[in-house]
Amino acid sequence: MSDSLRIVFAGTPDFAARHLEALLMSQHEVVGVLTRPDKPAGRGKKLTPSPVKVLAEERNITVFQPATLRSEENQQWVLKQQPDVLIVVAYGLILPKVVLNIPELGCLNVHGSLLPRWRGAAPIQRSLWAGDTETGVTIMQMDIGLDTGDMLYKARCPITPEDTSASLYEKLANIGPDALLKTLSLITSGKSQPETQNENLVTYAEKLSKEEARINWELSATHLERCIRAFNPWPMSFFEMEGQPIKVWKAEAIEEQTSVEPGTVLKADKEGIYIATADGILNITQLQPAGKKAMSAANLLNSKREWFTPGNKIN
């Protein structure tokens, strides 16, 4: 097999663009790019191209932006590119079986977890939410299931107690491209050894919702602190004061028991706002009132100390 593969790349956000960049700098030939249609963005709701489209057009690569790949006409576009392999990174559209079967080497996916743990839509966030100490990327052969295909390569990285979804996303965006290129080298040299996923180890990374981000004081402080990091930068953990959402950017869990009702303010000072939970105390150190920028707890107390009088109950 030739060392240089004809690749159709399918991806949309910056995470995907990092992988496309690595392919463009390699010996392989990217013959076409699939990405989601331009979307309204910003206050002016101006139609904005995806980071993948911007990069592809800078490099004069053919870009196709179908709303679906279920139509025969759109499938013909993929066929006409005559790819050896189709590489999917955070694309956002389902690839029907007929598309999966077009390239001789099938379709590869870069997935943001160590499969079979965290199949599904939000693997980066769920690894933080669950308190995992390690994650990574898996390069897998795609089939018609949801992240069920054989695994070809894994790259690992530790999760630190300071990591948020934003920082973990950045870590995986840094290790994923190299893992992808190594996988392609294994394939072209005939050394690839696909590994079947162990169904007994499967967990699912459900999509995040804004409602899930509402802080539930009936949970433990440790779990709430993990949620705050997992939901940063979206959808952002929050509670309400006077009907206004207050986003929480940073907090720490204190393993100290208290007999007061969960959601009760214990104290508030320049070190933070201490709130009772079902198990332990959550000290909130950085928050963002509606319509304001993120600020330290000390800054918010300068203007809204009455909100956090000890004994007050927070929704």
Curated annotation (Swiss-Prot):
SUPFAM superfamilies: FMT C-terminal domain-like, Formyltransferase. Gene3D superfamilies: Formyl transferase, C-terminal domain, Formyl transferase, N-terminal domain. It catalyses: L-methionyl-tRNA(fMet) + (6R)-10-formyltetrahydrofolate = N-formyl-L-methionyl-tRNA(fMet) + (6S)-5,6,7,8-tetrahydrofolate + H(+). It comes from the Bacteria. Keywords: Protein biosynthesis, Transferase. GO terms for cellular component: cytosol. It is an enzyme of class 2 (transferase). One of its GO terms (molecular function) is methionyl-tRNA formyltransferase activity. Belongs to the Fmt family. This is Methionyl-tRNA formyltransferase. It comes from Photorhabdus laumondii subsp. laumondii (strain DSM 15139 / CIP 105565 / TT01) (Photorhabdus luminescens subsp. laumondii).
